[in-house]
Amino acid sequence: MKKILKRIWKVCFCFLLMVILVNVLEPLFCRKPDETYAKKLRETEFTAETAGAERIYCIDDNEEALLWRLRMIGTAKKSIVLSTFDLRADENGTKLLAALNHAASKGVKIQLLIDGIYQQLFLAKSRDFQTLASCENVEVGVYNPVTPAHLLKVNYRMHDKYLIIDEKMYLLGGRNSNDIFLGDQKKGINEDRDILVYDTSEGQGESLLQLEDYFHKIWDESCVSRKKGKASSGSIDEQQHLEEIYASLLEKYHDLETYSAWEKDTEETNKITLIHNGTQAGRKAPQVLQAIQYLSENAKHVIIQTPYVICNDDMYEVLQGIADHAKLQIVLNAVEKGSNPWGCTDYLNQKKKILKTGADVYELMNDYPVHTKAVLIDERLSVVGSYNLDMRSTYLDTELMLVIDSKKLNQQIRSTEADYMEKSREILANGQETDGAKYQEKVLNWKKKFYYDVLKIMIRPIRQLL
């Protein structure tokens, strides 16, 4: 018996070791830029000289972000697609669940796609989520769930965040679906950005069709498992609970089901184009980074807003290539303010390499950590979405960005970036440091310094996973 147990233990140990080695070592072998995709970029028109059919509204406020989501869901007549990396059954996540549940009760078809890790962490035991998932016309897909069959692919996550309504409008950005990013909370939050896109051409908008096609592809991936909620013995009470939450939302926001000023409250754009990294749960070609590099080829000024920077040598080469012909500015959270310890720690290790690319860096001391991901290319193009300037977003995760040809949006975001720069410590490529007019210095306490000193050593072998 002891020999059998010993053999079982050895087999389990070897399997666990294999899982760890595959998940740590495989991401080290990053895919190179895709030549076929490079050709596609050259054949794609990212600008137009006249206004197109798709109109936009830029959402930078967390409470407004919740309101627009509720309006979109509340006015849906036929179909809703919600794809999100991190949905939680907290206060504002539950408000979304309640709105979706009410829409389902009216016969609206709902498809909900969630990343497998966060579904397991935050929704598996949620009665509200199970109640919604058990509705007849609600389908739930879980991307790359954490199961024995998927253990060798645990690194490949779905980082998308978008909402599609009735094939006539969508919202896409960097916000997750929880209290950190939605609602009127004032503590423990992040700032972020969404773009609401309204199509005036009755479902023929170019980027809307691109996003719908993308969703169909990822929904049909073999790594997506279909889940159906289990209605509990108290499911009637739970349905009533969600309806009560929705009723309270209608009292607070009177136009959730009657709002109709979509065209009036949005701005025209010349063109919107969706770019992405692919849908498979596997190593990705760096398509989003390729697109940013291509769009910046003839630029004179490029601003990159990212929560943090975690680059390999190939990514540093891209930044250096941009800085060789353009003024390159990178705005990121200061270590003293950032909410991601891995990103902060890697910055401490890699700061000199980032500056060596020729980029000027702005260490932002905002009131709240900034989770926004955006690239401004001269005064016309804005690239907005879920892509962080790190190896995970570049080579491992699914990512979506919108390339928007709109001088007005570019100016709006540029104004926000100017304010962020005033709240930052500017570090020029030559090492010269200057505090912005609104910069408020914060000193790390000894515990935080010690914590980062330890992490600086620990993360070196696994920085490709952060």
Residue spans of the language-model regions?
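Charged, low-complexity intrinsically disordered terminal segments
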Residues: K2-V138, P148-Y156, I165, M169-L466
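Phosphate-binding P-loop/Walker A region and its immediate neighborhood
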Residues: G141
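Short loop/turn segments at beta-alpha junctions that line or gate ligand-sensing/allosteric surfaces
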Residues: P145
